[in-house]
Amino acid sequence: MSTSKKVYCNTILNRISFFGFLLCSIVTCKANNTQGVYYLDLDICNERYPNSEQYLVPVSFRDGTLCVYPDYHTETQIRTPMGLDDTFLLVDRLGLRLPTPEVVDSIYSQADIRLAPIPMPPTSEMTTRAYYVQHDSLIDAQLAQSGYPNDPEILQSSQAKLITGHKKDVVYIDRNSSRVAIYGWHRLTGELIQPYSTVHHDEYFDYSHGIRPVSPEVFKDGEWVIWSD
């Protein structure tokens, strides 16, 4: 089924894995009072948002399909935090947007790999590159223990798995805000380390912050629809 074909259906997203490869997303539809199963093109997200730097993966959200980064934004293969101005420049360039707490929770509940958070001591060094490079190496060690290959090329391929738990998310806030909004860092129990907070100024970031761009639209009932906060 192509993205241009109109079908009216209630989407139930199932991510099917075969030898480690994502095969398809299934949409159960009711058209002309007939139940049927339609197969979405695997590249539906990546065809819609071709500027993405990572292979977008589907997440079920509000009875539709949302497209999300499988991991946090990286620069030179390092998960890299940044101030709010640069964050908005990034998502605008990609044609994407920041998630909301609701999206963060949906991603966590559907993740392929959930990592235990690794808080580091809250020192004056926590905003330095050396600190978040160190944190990144700890995350990579966790992924290696899980059996997930430490290969940056995977994030650009259909073999990418949805990973969560390893960072607080920078979440959507008004562009004119003087604060940055953060949320998440779920423990394996599902408990949050970081409730929604705007305590920091807009250009603050530290090693614990992650930027995960998501699509501004959901694919629902055969159409792309803008979702609101």
Features from the language model and the residues they span:
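Short, compositionally biased
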Residues: 12, 21, 29-85, 112-113, ...
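Bacterial N-terminal signal peptides
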Residues: 17-25
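Alpha-helix/helix-capping structural signal
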Residues: 26-27, 102
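N-terminal secretory signal peptides that target proteins for export/translocation
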Residues: 1-13
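Conserved hydrophobic ligand-interaction patch in extracellular adhesion modules
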Residues: 84-154, 213
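Intrinsically disordered, low-complexity, charge-dense segments enriched in Lys/Arg
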Residues: 133-216, 223-227
